């Protein structure tokens, strides 16, 4: 298709399926995107899966199905055409972005099950703060009532995934008014903070990573260092 365990402790490598965890902090979008591409292009059947966690500088990204007509008034925020599925979305400070770089073939996962697992991890995370997250048929992501709280856009190349999920934690939502989010005119967006949840990115990241590890049977091993150029 082209278009830490739950307690936060570092477990021994032999427990569960190992995956490396990279906490990248605040980063511009394009270098991380290009690094994902390179990682996916050069990995082989023995490569360890990785999850990258990042908070992007302001950017609109337009997926392969995206139309410029859905970008209404970007202003000073750059628009980047990317190789993930889906339409247009916004990334910015206060949004938790997780990129699972997984060998889906090795995991025995189809794309539908993979998407379902990511959505379920977000739904389970929200439930920790008594927020009811839901799926919508034919509209990937997670919604609370009529508002979207997590956008999902992926690509699979040679059976391996890149791109991922963007989860609104405590962010300025105004830039979403400059686009038709995910290609839907008038789609509302919301955040964890606006719904009474925590504003701390570290708190939400720990909860979401634990749920992703549970969904996909991983034990996450934090690793230091930036990405190779």
From Swiss-Prot:
HAMAP family documented for this protein: LipB
Residues covered by the BPL/LPL catalytic domain: 45-220
GO biological process: protein modification process
Lineage top rank: taxon: Bacteria
Main subcellular localisation: cytoplasm
UniProt keyword annotations, A-Z: Acyltransferase, Cytoplasm, Transferase
InterPro entries tied to this protein: aa-tRNA-synth_II/BPL/LPL, BPL_LPL_catalytic, Octanoyltransferase, Octanoyltransferase_CS
Site residues by UniProt (Lowers pKa of active site Cys): 148
Catalytic activity: octanoyl-[ACP] + L-lysyl-[protein] = N(6)-octanoyl-L-lysyl-[protein] + holo-[ACP] + H(+)
Enzyme Commission number(s) from the entry: 2.3.1.181
Cell compartments where the protein resides: Cytoplasm
General remark: In the reaction, the free carboxyl group of octanoic acid is attached via an amide linkage to the epsilon-amino group of a specific lysine residue of lipoyl domains of lipoate-dependent enzymes.
Catalytic residues as annotated in Swiss-Prot or TrEMBL: 182 (acyl-thioester intermediate)
One MF annotation (Gene Ontology) recorded for this entry: lipoyl(octanoyl) transferase activity
Name this protein carries in UniProt: Octanoyltransferase
A Gene Ontology cellular-component term: cytoplasm
Top-level EC class: transferase
PANTHER family: LIPOYLTRANSFERASE 2, MITOCHONDRIAL-RELATED, OCTANOYLTRANSFERASE
NCBIfam families attached to this UniProt entry: lipB, PRK14342.1
Record gene name: lipB
Function: Catalyzes the transfer of endogenously produced octanoic acid from octanoyl-acyl-carrier-protein onto the lipoyl domains of lipoate-dependent enzymes. Lipoyl-ACP can also act as a substrate although octanoyl-ACP is likely to be the physiological substrate.
Family: Belongs to the LipB family.
Pathway: Protein modification; protein lipoylation via endogenous pathway; protein N(6)-(lipoyl)lysine from octanoyl-[acyl-carrier-protein]: step 1/2
Record-listed substrate binding positions: 84-91, 151-153, 164-166
Keyword Acyltransferase: yes
């Amino acid at each position: 298709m082209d278009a830490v365990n739950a307690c936060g402790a570092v477990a021994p490598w032999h427990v569960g399926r190992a995956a490396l965890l990279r906490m990248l902090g605040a980063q511009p979008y394009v270098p991380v995107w290009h690094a994902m591409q390179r990682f996916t292009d050069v990995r082989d059947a023995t490569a360890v899966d990785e999850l990258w966690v990042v908070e992007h500088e302001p950017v609109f990204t337009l997926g392969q199905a995206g139309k410029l007509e859905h970008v209404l008034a970007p202003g000073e925020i750059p628009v980047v055409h990317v190789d993930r599925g889906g339409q247009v979305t916004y990334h910015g400070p206060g949004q938790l972005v997780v990129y699972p770089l997984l060998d889906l073939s090795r995991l025995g996962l189809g794309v539908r099950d993979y998407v379902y697992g990511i959505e379920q991890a977000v739904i389970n995370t929200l439930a920790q703060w008594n927020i009811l997250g839901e799926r919508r048929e034919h509209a990937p992501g997670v919604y609370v009532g009529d508002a979207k709280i997590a956008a999902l856009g992926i690509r699979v190349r040679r059976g391996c995934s890149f791109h991922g999920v963007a989860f609104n934690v405590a962010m300025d939502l105004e830039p979403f008014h400059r686009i038709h989010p995910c290609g839907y005119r008038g789609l509302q967006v919301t955040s964890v903070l606006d719904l009474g949840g925590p504003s701390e990115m570290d708190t939400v990241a720990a909860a979401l990573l634990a749920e992703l590890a549970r969904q996909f049977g991983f034990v996450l091993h934090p690793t230091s260092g930036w990405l190779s150029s």
